[in-house]
Amino acid sequence: MKTNYLILGVSTLISKNVGHISQIIGPVLDVTFPPGKMPNIYNSLIVRGQNPAGQEINVTCEVQQLLGNNKVRAVAMSATDGLTRGMKVTDTGAPLSVPVGEVTLGRIFNVLGEPVDNLGAIDVSTTFPIHRSAPAFTQLDTKLSIFETGIKVVDLLAPYRRGGKIGLFGGAGVGKTVLIMELINNIAKAHGGVSVFGGVGERTREGNDLYMEMKESKVINEQDISESKVALVYGQMNEPPGARMRVGLTALTMAEYFRDVNKQDVLLFIDNIFRFVQAGSEVSALLGRMPSAVGYQPTLSTEMGSLQERITSTKEGSITSIQAVYVPADDLTDPAPATTFAHLDATTVLSRGLAAKGIYPAVDPLDSTSTMLQPWIVGEEHYETAQGVKQTLQRYKELQDIIAILGLDELSEEDRLTVARARKIERFLSQPFFVAEVFTGSPGKYVSLIETIKGFQMILAGELDGLPEQAFYLVGNIDEVTAKAETLQMES
């Protein structure tokens, strides 16, 4: 692919420092420069030339180490096939820069900020370097506020913090992608915000599927691309470790522009944060650093911190991040997930059991947690309602073994009432999504936090004990439950 030098923050490569490749070890290059002409750490270098077959080569690298004797060690952002010793390397004199702003919406980019969706070039008049400092303390917004998503189970039981970081846990086929798309849709409608999706080291097929589903659900508008609500940045499994290590920063940089310049609320999705750590581990080994615990890089905490600290609320806007977390061998004490947990404000756990029952979103109400669910943050009413819902569901879980063996009739009157209410709560936690309208045929619902609390209070208080369970399934607020119950009664 032809490299756009404007994207790299360089208008011309004439009069730049030029060196030559002295060693190639996979994706790592050693480059020798003339004395006194050494590039800085994180500067991007460009290797141009022709391979033995006569094809053009254009490889961008990032300086990682200064080795002495006028040598630097750099990591390639694309495949190093066809590179040979002695090839000329040009120092651009600046870190890698990527395009930012409205031009990125509805498009797919690689780590270098080049469009890879075959929809033509984009305007690159505004670029940001991918290595930036976290906002200063004086710019931070320290007020704790809830980020309302319009999804009942999330807002009530594991509320997101505005400018916070949320871990999304779930296996294959339980609805992670649909939940992500609904959040992208809701932030655009309710908050006037935009989203950036960073695909870090995941399957190319999944990235393609997500793009197709976003077009189908109109999150990406093919007819008018400027009406799209999301920018996509992909550095998938087949990319070299340098690209996978930096693609998260490319996505974050695009999100920072919307927060700092456009003063918007931004959702940043990173799928998968573990692959960011994994790529860093590969690069660390290639650079010859001594590995730390379990073979991870010694700079694990620093690398994670430099990414996570840039994700925050300022007085201008906010970046709320939702990060899919892969847990290797289901070991939560592994250094990669353990380091990630230190930064998270909430966890959303998707349950295969709920998905099997047809309850979507399949968010586990008992396993999902949030640091925001405190009475002095969300208020006494919200806190008490959430605790009541959790207690009822927990009691139902404890009684399930007895019900399976002896049947419902053997329970006490009080327990039978608890089970009936718990089953209604379980169904009321389901909700039709806007982005799933094309599959389900039922219109999506955005439920405000006030309506959510009111609905669950009425169920817990026994005001709706007379309504059938089916009336609570896949509806929005409590008024729709009573309307659905009347319809069911008329039909029967």
From Swiss-Prot:
Specify the protein's topology with respect to the membrane.
Answer: Peripheral membrane protein
Give the enzyme's EC designation.
Answer: 7.1.2.2
**Family as reported in the entry's similarity comment:** Belongs to the ATPase alpha/beta chains family.
Q: Which NCBIfam families match?
A: atpD (TIGR01039)
Q: How does it assemble?
A: F-type ATPases have 2 components, CF(1) - the catalytic core - and CF(0) - the membrane proton channel. CF(1) has five subunits: alpha(3), beta(3), gamma(1), delta(1), epsilon(1). CF(0) has four main subunits: a(1), b(1), b'(1) and c(9-12).
Q: Which UniProt keywords apply?
A: ATP synthesis, ATP-binding, CF(1), Chloroplast, Hydrogen ion transport, Ion transport, Membrane, Nucleotide-binding, Plastid, Thylakoid, Translocase, Transport
The name on file for this protein is ATP synthase subunit beta, chloroplastic
Where this protein primarily resides, as one coarse class? plastid
Cross-referenced PROSITE patterns? ATPASE_ALPHA_BETA
Explain the purpose of this protein. Answer: Produces ATP from ADP in the presence of a proton gradient across the membrane. The catalytic sites are hosted primarily by the beta subunits.
Chain's gene name: atpB
Please tell me where ATP binds in this chain.
Answer: G170, G171, A172, G173, V174, G175, K176, T177
Entry-linked CDD domains: ATP-synt_F1_beta_C, ATP-synt_F1_beta_N, F1-ATPase_beta_CD
Pfam families given in the database record = ATP-synt_ab, ATP-synt_ab_N, ATP-synt_VA_C
